[in-house]
């Protein structure tokens, strides 16, 4: 759903896959996103990214989203992605998975 729009920018708020799937191919000039980390926080939303049963499922969810991002990006579009590594910092419970055995 559109969250904000003016003559220079449109911001969307909602489930990433649902919003992206509703957009036409090549219609976005820039995507700025910071997906939730795996196993770090529960936002209380069914189907939320980061609450998958395993790191492999988490990666698969991100791949699905970014395949749609690629589809909607213009040929000269840019993606700004903030994706931290909570495994490296040890700041997460990571759903009980150890850093060396996950991916």
Descriptions of predicted regions:
Residues 1-103:
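S-adenosyl-L-methionine-dependent nucleic acid methyltransferase catalytic domains
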């Amino acid at each position: 759903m559109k969250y904000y729009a003016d003559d220079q920018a449109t911001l969307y708020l909602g489930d990433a896959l649902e919003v992206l799937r509703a957009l036409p191919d090549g219609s976005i000039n820039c995507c700025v996103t910071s997906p939730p980390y795996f196993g770090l926080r529960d936002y209380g939303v069914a189907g939320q990214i980061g609450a998958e049963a395993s790191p492999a499922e988490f990666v698969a969810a991100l791949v699905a989203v970014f395949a749609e991002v690629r589809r909607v990006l213009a040929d000269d579009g840019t993606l700004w992605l903030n994706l931290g590594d909570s495994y490296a910092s040890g700041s997460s419970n990571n759903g009980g998975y150890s850093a060396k055995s996950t991916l």
